[in-house]
A protein has these predicted regions:
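A polyanion-binding, active-site-adjacent surface
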Residues: 1-170
């Protein structure tokens, strides 16, 4: 299966206990649909399980998870990887790619490439939907198209792996 790994819960995700249910989730669903994928076809999780936020003028604002927070949640993520046994992991954003592909991952330079990893056949990183939503005009359309393409590449890699497995069965 394909496992999508984001950063961590935002406000809505924290309230519902489900990943990607806010605006970023709606964009993710659109990009999945353009690749003929629904949430029924994938697993979705985050590298941290609690909302990482800071207070600003008595308002909570999302922030990237700290290394300590990522490390504290790693056993839970490792257990999910063990149970799901994904063929391909799609990391959304730098924090996810840093945690799962390699530290110091450079999302703009390395997204869209496949990496061999110990917990799946491959991992690939893509831009996070929340980042895409912060772009405007043509920049929004361009980075959204890269997310659609990266999801498509992940989907095709899963299909390729399944076809190779089917050939070895007979």
């Amino acid at each position: 299966p394909l496992l999508i790994v984001g950063e961590g819960p935002g406000e809505r995700e924290d309230l519902t206990g489900r990943p990607f249910v806010g605006r970023a989730g709606a964009l993710l669903d659109e990009c999945l649909a353009e690749n003929r994928i629904t949430r029924k076809h994938v697993y979705i999780t985050n590298i941290v399980k609690c909302r990482a936020c800071s207070s600003e003028n008595s308002r909570k604002r999302n922030r990237p998870p700290s290394t300590a927070e990522t490390n504290a949640c790693r056993p839970y993520l490792d257990r999910q990887l063990e149970i799901i046994r994904p063929r391909v992991v799609l990391c959304l954003g730098s924090p996810s790619a840093n945690a799962l592909i390699h530290t110091n991952f450079r999302i703009m330079q390395e997204r869209g490439r496949f990496f061999e990893v110990p917990f799946a056949d491959y991992a690939i990183a893509a831009l996070h939907p929340a980042y895409i939503l912060r772009q405007g005009g043509q920049a929004f359309r361009d980075v959204r198209a890269t997310l659609v393409a990266d999801i498509g590449a992940a989907r095709l890699k899963v299909v390729e792996i399944r076809k190779a497995e089917a050939k070895t069965l007979f």
